[in-house]
A protein has these predicted regions:
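Histidine- and aromatic-rich ligand-binding microenvironments
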Residues: 6, 40, 93-95, 116, ...
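Acidic, PIN/NYN-like endoribonuclease modules and their adjacent C-terminal/linker elements
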Residues: 102, 106-136
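A generic structural signal for short hydrophobic patches within well-formed alpha-helices
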Residues: 10, 44-47, 119-120
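Short, well-structured N-terminal submotif of metal-dependent ribonuclease cores
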Residues: 1-39, 49-62, 136
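Generic structural signal for small/hydrophobic residues in well-ordered secondary structure
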Residues: 6-7, 47, 80, 105
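A general structural signal for well-ordered alpha-helical segments in protein cores
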Residues: 25, 40, 44, 57-60, ...
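Active-site neighborhoods of divalent-metal-dependent phosphate/nucleic-acid chemistry enzymes
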Residues: 68-115
């Protein structure tokens, strides 16, 4: 199964003070070893905005240039708005970018690797699948 790795996992893994054996780091390593990891521009943008040192930004650009990228279409944006509204009606708060990331996973048949609990709540109300780390 192809995996989209969310900003929350990348940022934990790239922090200098992150424990090397954190569940998120272990899952990211496992996902990368499967060679079935994809990304999207929004996730790279969020990471680049969050890390100021130029060396760290260069490392992010280098890592992300090796990954296939999925790009949202107009239909994905419309479907993401619908998904967000569905979640909101169910009492689940999902941000605009998170709704689009979830929709990309649904559109491209991807599993999402995330440390963000909002996605767990959203997955109860849509076809979003979360990566369990059991392999591809």
């Amino acid at each position: 199964m192809t995996v989209l790795v969310d900003t929350s996992v990348w940022s934990l893994a790239l922090r200098r003070d992150a424990p090397p054996n954190s569940p998120e780091a272990v899952q990211l390593t496992k996902a990368l070893e499967s060679e079935l990891v994809v990304t999207t521009g929004l996730i790279m943008q969020e990471l680049l905005q969050g890390f100021l040192p130029e060396r760290t930004q260069a490392e992010i650009r280098r890592r992300f240039s090796a990954l296939p990228a999925v790009q949202p279409t107009r239909d994905d944006h419309v479907a993401a708005a619908d998904l967000r509204n569905t979640c909101r009606r169910a009492g689940v708060q999902l941000g605009t970018i998170d709704a689009l990331i979830a929709q990309l996973c649904i559109t491209y048949d991807l599993e999402l690797l995330s440390a963000d609990r909002d996605f767990e709540h959203a997955a109860r109300h849509c076809k979003l699948r979360l990566w369990a780390g059991t392999g591809a």
